[in-house]
Every structure is written in C-alpha cells, then in structure tokens.
Amino acid sequence: MSEVRVRENETLDSALRRFKRQCAMSGIMSEVRKREHYDKPSVKRKKKAEAARRKNAKK
C-alpha cells in the first residue's frame, strides 16, 4: 500500500502528484486492472502466447 505524508508547506496537488507517481512505480494500478475480472487459465495462456509472439515480431 502506497502512503504519502503531506510535508510542511506542501500543497495538496504536489502530494497527490507524489502519490500517483508512487502508485505508478509500484504497479498497483496495473495489478488492479489485471485482477478486475477473472481470466480462465486458457485465456491467460493465449494472452501470454500472443504477447510473446508480439515481442518476437518486434525484434
């Protein structure tokens, strides 16, 4: 869980910006999106294979 304490003489906007950056760096939002809906194991395998195919095509 990301936690940001508002510093002395710090605006709420800058504290919110720090919090958002911290969440992005820790990968919280991507994890939430990934767990938002259940994916069957077969669908997970298909997505993984497609990602590998895209990665190899990029090279």
From Swiss-Prot:
**Record's keyword terms, sorted:** Ribonucleoprotein, Ribosomal protein
What is the protein's name according to its record?
Answer: Small ribosomal subunit protein bS21
In this chain, the stretch annotated as Disordered covers 32-59
- Any S-S bridges, and between which cysteines? none
Record field: compositional bias (Basic and acidic residues): 32-42
Q: Which family does it belong to?
A: Belongs to the bacterial ribosomal protein bS21 family.
GO MF annotation terms: structural constituent of ribosome
Q: Which InterPro entries match?
A: Ribosomal_bS21, Ribosomal_bS21_sf
The Gene Ontology biological process annotation of the record reads: translation
